[in-house]
């Protein structure tokens, strides 16, 4: 959820759009939770080849998600961050561990830069009080820059991301078409047939 990650996403969109198998040179993005949130940041960078986005089960503010009401979210957020911290270690995911064990030297060399990653949970706990510079990472402050059609879904009872996302729906002011489907349900229901 950083400006560097959004820039990487811009590059991915433009790289994929230039592949010979991409019809008309345009791509869309779809994803639930982290991939949904990430595409909001990417779309705000306005990649020329991005056709539309479908973010599902997202949040509007990273800090308020981690510190709702000023109290550290030691439930889902802590567990989610701990899992990410484990996965970013060298060989921290089954697929990269298997590639290394099979002798993939490029994968092994790429994994060496993993030591540059920081402890997300420790970082999140350190931000006890909202700081003005955190606004740069507020999802809600980026969505007014999105200039492609948006289909966004979210559950009022989402046990992982909550319902605060609805506060930013009015801010999709530059998107030529928007459709928001809000429903009673849970986090993974963004993929369900009911939406």
Where do the model's predicted regions map?
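Gly/Ser-rich "nucleophile elbow"/oxyanion-hole loop immediately N-terminal to the catalytic nucleophile
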Residues: 1-4, 11-28, 33
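Post-His helix in hydrolase/transferase enzymes
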Residues: 4, 190-195
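Active-site loop->helix "elbow" adjoining a glycine-rich segment at hydrolase catalytic centers
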Residues: 30-38, 46
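Active-site nucleophile loop of the alpha/beta-hydrolase fold
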Residues: 32-34, 54-63, 184-187
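Accessory cap/linker subdomain of secreted extracellular hydrolases
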Residues: 41-145
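Short beta-strand/loop motif that positions the catalytic acidic residue
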Residues: 146, 152-154
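Conserved alpha/beta-hydrolase "acid-adjacent" motif
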Residues: 159-166
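Catalytic histidine neighborhood in serine/cysteine hydrolases
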Residues: 173-189
């Amino acid at each position: 959820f950083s400006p560097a990650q959004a820039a990487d996403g811009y590059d991915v969109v433009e790289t994929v759009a230039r592949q010979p198998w991409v019809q008309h040179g345009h791509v869309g993005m779809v994803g639930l939770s982290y991939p949904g949130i990430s595409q909001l940041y990417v779309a705000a960078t306005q990649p020329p080849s991005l056709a539309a986005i479908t973010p599902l089960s997202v949040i509007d503010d990273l800090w308020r998600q981690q510190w709702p009401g000023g109290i550290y979210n030691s439930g889902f957020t802590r567990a989610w961050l701990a899992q990410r911290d484990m996965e970013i270690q060298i060989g921290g995911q089954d697929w990269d561990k298997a590639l290394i064990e099979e002798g993939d030297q490029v994968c092994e060399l790429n994994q060496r830069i993993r030591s540059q990653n920081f402890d997300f949970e420790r970082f999140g706990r350190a931000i006890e009080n909202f700081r003005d510079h955190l606004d740069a990472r507020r999802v809600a402050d980026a969505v007014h820059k999105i200039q492609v059609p948006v289909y966004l879904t979210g559950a009022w009872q989402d046990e992982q991301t909550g319902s605060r996302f609805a506060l930013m729906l009015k801010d999709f002011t530059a998107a030529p078409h928007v459709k928001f489907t809000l429903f009673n349900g849970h986090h993974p229901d963004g993929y369900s047939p009911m939406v």
